[in-house]
């Protein structure tokens, strides 16, 4: 993922795929990839399914800079994850069942399905508002435990991995396992 042209095209592809899969509405969610000097991330206000050129993404460093004002509001969260891991890519999405489960569960979502248990283990739920140090610290702490994905309570999921396909698969699995758990719990009432 070293070529900037390839990077924005990869971000555009996976942004469209997230939206068409129902894992985000087109306006919400973020995608980034690690670069040699930092990360490339969607610009603020750009819809995930409407990334059409390199101008729709921006490269920023791993530490705050003047470019942060035009980068995604989730840039601090992405930085925190990159600084805490060796991840090469991150997807932040708003999968509905994962968000619901984050409001119903205490500290983690425990998958019940035979795919989610070995693939995800448990999914930590972290608190903190978008762009806050609290969220950044909680994400870094959760990722230091070696998890594949984390859900920010009432907000959305973060998946960090080796590439955007890996992150997409984790995001889809978090949503699938959350949906199965929600429906199972509902049926048992």
Regions found by a protein language model. Give the residues of each.
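Glycine-rich flexible loops
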Residues: 1-189
